[in-house]
Amino acid sequence: MNAKALYKKKALRDRRKLRIKSKLLGDKLRPRVSVFRSNRYFYAQAIDDVKQSTITHIDGRKMGFKNTQEDAKKLGALFAEELKKAGIERAVYDRNGYLYHGVVAAFAESLRENGIVL
């Protein structure tokens, strides 16, 4: 891709991100689960927007998981355990401007399968 196409792609994602985030709000009882995917790894965190703090997070890079659907399902199961340890049963899913497809969808489905209501 040339520079102009990359700029447009990032600008469109940023617009989607702002539009989504304007409608979502997480608190201590129902935090916002924000995901980030790079070309190689996958990350997620539970955010309390009222206090502007992270409740818990998971880092696929440190755990040796790649950016694949199978690894996203495993990360989702581990992250669901972390949320349950923190006393969280419900959350708001923030896909962070990414399309609900592939690893982003697999992670969300894994959270749902492991008892987190999104």
UniProtKB/Swiss-Prot annotation:
Function: This is one of the proteins that bind and probably mediate the attachment of the 5S RNA into the large ribosomal subunit, where it forms part of the central protuberance.
Disulfide bonds: none
Any one GO molecular-function label of the UniProt entry: structural constituent of ribosome
Transmembrane stretches, start-end: none
GO biological process entries: translation
Name recorded for this polypeptide: Large ribosomal subunit protein uL18
Organism: Helicobacter pylori (strain J99 / ATCC 700824)
Keyword terms: Ribonucleoprotein, Ribosomal protein, RNA-binding, rRNA-binding
Keyword Coiled coil among record annotations: no
NCBIfam families named in the record: L18_bact
Lineage: Bacteria, Pseudomonadati, Campylobacterota, Epsilonproteobacteria, Campylobacterales
PANTHER family per UniProt: 39S RIBOSOMAL PROTEIN L18, MITOCHONDRIAL, LARGE RIBOSOMAL SUBUNIT PROTEIN UL18M
Family: Belongs to the universal ribosomal protein uL18 family.
GO CC annotations, alphabetized: cytosolic large ribosomal subunit
Annotated CDD domains: Ribosomal_L18_L5e
Quaternary structure (record): Part of the 50S ribosomal subunit; part of the 5S rRNA/L5/L18/L25 subcomplex. Contacts the 5S and 23S rRNAs.
Coiled coil (UniProt feature): none
Pfam families: Ribosomal_L18p
